[in-house]
């Protein structure tokens, strides 16, 4: 049986003590780092998790933001966006989901002790643009041109989403790249399952995923991590990336889902991705995401019969490929039930908002 290992990276948004949305306009790095400082550090995490050049990512939790550097490349500051939780790499979907839940609970407790609430939403509901100020210096201008992702890194300051990671044991570079191309092609049919960004600029924007509408075309849907020395695929946005740690070799990272409030949904989506990687019947392949189709999906979701049919095809193919994996099969069956109900976090958020509840700091006038 093909073996996979799993990891989840989950971006968390925050609410201030008065219930307003916390972001780069009203929150400091030190304020959020104080939460991280209260959480435990386990040196064993470092075998699986990358610390990064700035040293901010020493724990499973870290302050997510936009780093600014001086003229010599030394870190000056990190403008905060929110907090991120990263799990280690686990041998099963169940273990990865359980780890995320446990670390989410620890984060919720530490944030509450400092007057902040943790929430899940795919897009900043108040500010839809982050402006880089002051302008880049010469070192930053060079640095931000290195990869397509560096050139568009400012976009992530208003979006929140997961990286769902599958480490594929024994995969070849060609198979890994082919799987990333398949997931990139199928992405517009899959992402409505996760949509959680129906608000922007202070209210509903008329669609279900402001995150998808903004990021697609500039940011990857899926990445394949290849060993050093293996040729990369030239694409913008990227399809491949050089592995920075040994555990990253053979990893598929799906990046197009919105942030989800339910860890169980992440588990179901990981099983869906597993089935799609194992599937041998679906012909769809793309090196870069279909921008127009993603943006259409961001607005209408499965209200479009063609998008709905594409999702049904993907769910059916994944279910067939998982026939000998009962736990994954059960999760995809649960996901299919959500799909049949046209259920998504965005629709639940809009229903609460219409009922007069406060959602991510917003309340209906």
Descriptions of predicted regions:
Residues 85-89, 116-132:
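Short, glycine/charge-rich beta-strand/loop segments that flank catalytic centers
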Residues 167-179, 191-197, 263:
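Inter-helical turn/loop segments and adjacent helix faces that build the functional surface
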């Amino acid at each position: 049986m093909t073996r996979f290992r799993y990891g989840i990276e989950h971006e968390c948004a925050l609410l201030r003590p008065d219930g307003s949305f916390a972001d780069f306009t009203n929150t400091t790095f030190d304020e959020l780092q104080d939460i991280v400082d209260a959480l435990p550090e386990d040196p064993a995490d470092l075998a699986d998790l990358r610390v990064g050049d700035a040293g901010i990512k020493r724990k499973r939790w870290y302050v997510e933001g936009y780093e600014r550097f001086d003229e010599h490349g030394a870190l000056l500051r990190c403008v905060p966006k929110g907090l991120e939780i990263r799990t280690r790499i686990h041998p099963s979907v169940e273990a990865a989901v359980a780890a995320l839940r446990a670390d989410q609970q620890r984060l919720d407790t530490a944030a509450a002790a400092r007057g902040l609430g943790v929430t899940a939403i795919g897009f900043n509901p108040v500010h839809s643009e982050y402006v880089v100020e002051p302008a880049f210096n010469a070192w930053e201008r060079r640095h931000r041109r290195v990869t397509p992702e560096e050139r568009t890194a400012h976009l992530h300051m208003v979006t929140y989403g997961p990286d769902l990671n599958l480490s594929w044991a024994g995969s070849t570079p060609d198979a890994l790249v082919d799987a990333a191309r398949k997931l990139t092609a199928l992405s517009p049919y899959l992402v409505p399952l996760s949509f959680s960004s129906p608000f922007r600029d202070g209210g509903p924007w008329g669609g279900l995923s402001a995150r998808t509408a903004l990021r697609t075309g500039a940011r990857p849907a899926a990445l394949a991590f290849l060993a050093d020395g293996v040729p990369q695929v030239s694409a913008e946005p990227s399809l491949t990336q050089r592995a920075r740690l040994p555990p990253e070799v053979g990893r598929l990272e799906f990046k197009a889902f919105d942030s989800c409030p339910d860890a169980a949904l992440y588990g179901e989506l990981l099983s869906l991705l597993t089935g799609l990687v194992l599937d041998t019947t679906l012909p769809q392949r793309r090196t870069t995401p279909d921008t127009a189709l993603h943006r259409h999906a961001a607005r209408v979701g499965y209200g479009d019969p063609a998008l709905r049919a594409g999702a049904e095809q993907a769910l059916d193919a994944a279910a067939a490929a998982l026939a000998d994996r009962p736990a994954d099969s059960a999760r995809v069956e649960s996901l299919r039930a959500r799909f049949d109900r046209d259920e998504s976090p965005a629709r639940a958020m809009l229903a609460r908002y219409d009922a007069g509840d406060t959602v991510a700091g917003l309340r209906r006038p």
